[in-house]
């Protein structure tokens, strides 16, 4: 499976509940940042994956963190962005 395919697999998995958001964020960040050849992505994928990457890198499951304005993203925000990115594919 290519890195691109792995990213889509993770997105589909977090949306359907196969992955917890924390695990999704860790894996998406690692694969996108270190294993993905961005030249192989479509323009829509580049934009969507980059936006999602910026969010997963700042995911927190702690309420205290989430109270800091414009710093961290919640589970709900990550899932909403994943669904938005998924909609770009179809």
Predicted regions and their residues:
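Acidic, Ser/Pro/Thr-rich low-complexity regulatory regions
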Residues: 1-90
């Amino acid at each position: 499976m290519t890195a691109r395919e792995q990213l889509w697999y993770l997105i589909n998995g977090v949306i359907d509940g196969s992955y917890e958001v924390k695990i999704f964020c860790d894996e998406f960040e690692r694969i996108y940042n270190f294993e993905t050849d961005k030249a192989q992505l479509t323009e829509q994928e580049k934009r969507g994956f980059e936006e999602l990457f910026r969010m997963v890198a700042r995911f927190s499951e702690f309420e205290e963190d989430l109270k800091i304005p414009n710093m961290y993203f919640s589970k709900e925000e990550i899932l909403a962005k994943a669904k938005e990115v998924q909609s770009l594919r179809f």
